[in-house]
Design a protein with these regions (language model features):
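Bulky hydrophobic/aromatic content
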Residues: 25, 54, 60-61, 65-141
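Short, hydrophobic/amphipathic alpha-helical patches that form generic packing surfaces
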Residues: 7-15, 91-95, 267, 271-272
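Core beta-strand-centered patch of the WYL/Sm-like small regulatory domain
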Residues: 109-224
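A residue-level signal for conserved active-site and pocket-lining positions in enzyme catalytic cores
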Residues: 12, 49, 132, 225, ...
Length: 301
């Protein structure tokens, strides 16, 4: 029951935030009648609507305001929630789920990428994170023939490249390690507790990198990419990194600037963009991408 109520809160939040100019109760009720969560297609009682609104600040941290004059449109008051990546991702995922549910008659024409399932593993890890409990896990890496078991401190989880990853801290190595959830054979939440460092921030850890490798030992550098062709529009609508900015633009190309760490994941990403992306700076990154390109060219000789 609690899960269903939470989904309704998510639906209401997404419905209101999607209305750029606000939305009336009548419009919300009409959308609710067509919503996949409303199996019987009933109208939304105003009392229920009020209860949902009153619960949003506690449940999701969302505050809704209403215009003081007709037609009394509702809108999100604290737009800063859009900077909450987890809430934003959850709302988008739920909205997509509703769209697919309402389009069952064309389900064979709606395609999504497969994400390795690790729901139970993710649930156990998130529970341990909330409780600051150690976890025991049995792990099988991709690059070895053996598996091993150990205790560790679950600090954070991250979704990257259609895979969930655990960032966990090892006291014996005095560093964080990254584990693919689909490679965890078994995981248990332990009673043993740990203290999260007061200054730890997963967002800050990955602030200057892409993917799952933070590369904190690498310097933060200014990166310049010269992008041409279709890739200009693509990167304009889906930036490579939050620090992306336009440095120069002409009829044929756009030069973007970034503040990043030049990790191996960045090198691989830029190599994959092919001839439409040229690294201008730094020289070391340009050389790494060049070496990758030469290796690929050698394969296809």
């Amino acid at each position: 029951m609690a899960k269903e109520i939470y989904r309704r809160y998510m639906w209401l939040t997404d419905t209101i935030r999607s209305a750029k100019n606000g939305i009336t109760f009548e419009q919300i009720s009409s959308k609710w009648q067509r919503c996949s969560l409303n199996i019987k297609g009933e109208e939304l009682p105003k009392r229920t609507f009020r209860n949902w609104l009153n619960s949003l600040p506690t449940a999701l941290g969302v505050v809704v305001e209403c215009d003081k004059k007709a037609p009394f449109r509702y809108r999100i008051a604290n737009r800063e929630i859009e900077r909450n990546d987890l809430l934003e991702w959850s709302l988008n995922a739920m909205a997509l789920g509703n769209i697919i549910s309402e389009s069952n008659d064309i389900h064979d024409r709606i395609m999504v990428d497969d994400i390795p399932t690790a729901n139970e593993t993710l649930r156990i890890i998130c529970s341990a994170m909330r409780n600051c409990h150690m976890i025991w896990m049995h792990y099988q890496p991709f690059d070895t023939d053996y598996d091993y078991s150990f205790n560790t401190k679950p600090y954070a989880v991250k979704l990257s490249g259609n895979r969930w990853y655990l960032i966990a801290h090892s006291d014996s190595h005095n560093r964080d390690f990254c584990y693919g959830l689909d490679r965890i054979l078994e995981v248990k939440e332990l009673e043993e507790t740990f203290q999260m460092p007061k200054d730890y921030s997963a967002q800050e850890k990955f602030k200057y990198s892409i993917g799952i490798y933070a590369g904190e030992q690498l310097p933060i550098e200014e990166v310049k990419l010269k992008v041409s062709g279709y890739l200009q529009d693509y990167m304009e609508t889906l930036p490579l990194h939050w620090s992306q900015r336009v440095v120069e633009r002409d009829e044929k190309s756009t030069t973007y600037g970034y503040t990043m760490r030049c990790t191996y994941e960045l090198v691989d990403k830029l190599t994959g963009l092919g001839s439409f992306c040229q690294v201008l700076e730094p020289l070391s990154l340009r050389q790494q991408v060049r070496e990758n390109a030469l290796k690929i060219a050698e394969i296809y000789k």
